[in-house]
């Protein structure tokens, strides 16, 4: 039977793929979501609070949602929406009048997840300050590098992380101090003091500086405007469940771009965000699962390692309806295991980046059935697939570098004109550096990072493709594929493999089973058995650490 033909709409776009022959780009198949005019002054908090659904328990339209805005997953302490707004307003005023923050000031945040962190984010954003969150587990040297990159003048930390901050910061505020508690309860202007002028924040102004992962190169600081978060949250708002309370377990770190977004989104949608504090996180995946059960959450954000680990936990999670997963690829065998273990849960894969925001995601049960894809292109987003050698745009079904254009894209890297020049083209397209393709049904597939392609003779071998094959082998727990220098071939693919406990799997068996499933030039040429694969909190393989590991290994036979 012939494949169904792709129809075109009035604009000449394929109704199946979104490909437009005139522009040689793919547009989202989803209905466009209206956004505020870009020249209208509007901070993200203003936009978020305007979206809040009103309580159905009263005829008064002024009442906020009756459910809590935030719940501590460990203690059960809750913050109502009324209390949340009151704290945000009090803190915003105190940050201006008592701390001296002004619009454009960069605030470095080095604090573990807690109920005060979302309040701090919203307060900073509402006065036009720039939020720059970082991983509290970083070393002092790493923290110093990020503070320097962002140009932060003030830092918010806790007692245990403040010692990592470099000297030279104008102000350091500890979230676990009486001083900060007094800022949260600030009652306004002191008697006789001149009132502060009203803050006007434009959508084009920087809201956050977030750091690229640095898994494959030096860390860079991406500046994201208020409009970026307005656009992303508007898309989620258009799909929100009407007239019901939604409880979401925030399984992504608050400093991570995904966790940061979902903190903002949860408030804007009137959902209850169950915050995973250190007390829960220390218990690992078991702690997350127990929190999901205890609070009967319907939604959950999770990285691939968490999704993998959930299949090994003894739990049912009857209330759970959806998991949003992103940050790194999830092998098809792992997805199949999850679906068998939790058939009532939609595992919604998504794809995005710190620099581009959300690029694609799954939004329905039908879309979740397209295993291996990252969903369809997000509303209001336009992408191109470009041959990375010739620069020629490609149609559906062909692999090339993914370029993105849309309202959620970053303004640029802070203080790095060289990186900006290579990342953006003259028409505003952001080059992701990811090798992708869009299939005949409009689903986006991420093949690999272009920088990570292994140059074997005249061929390019995607490590992620080989990693998926390795993950499909029953005796392998985890795996990574790396290039290794070779005199004749240039580079050869080397697999680092974590075996199942007690497995007697051999190097020859691994190489044989992979060779049966790939083209000859993609074959694994060497296998090293290791105890673990180093990964970031989001599940990305830390390839730089593996490079060091390979250097230490004896590879004289290659």
UniProtKB/Swiss-Prot annotation:
SBD2: annotated segments: 350-413
Gene: 4CLL7
Binding-site residues, CoA: 282, 457-458
Keyword check for Ligase: yes
Source organism, top-level taxon: Eukaryota
UniProt domain comment: Both substrate-binding domains (SBD1 and SBD2) are involved in the substrate recognition, and are sufficient to confer the substrate specificity.
Annotated Pfam families: AMP-binding (PF00501), AMP-binding_C (PF13193)
Membrane-spanning ranges: none
Name of the molecule in the record: 4-coumarate--CoA ligase-like 7
SUPFAM superfamilies referenced in this protein's UniProt entry, alphabetically: Acetyl-CoA synthetase-like
GO MF, any single term: ATP binding
Organism of derivation: Oryza sativa subsp. japonica
Residues engaged in binding ATP: 212-216, 220, 350, 354, 434, 449, 540
Annotated EC: 6.2.1.12
The keyword Nucleotide-binding appears for this protein: yes
GO biological process, alphabetically ordered: phenylpropanoid metabolic process
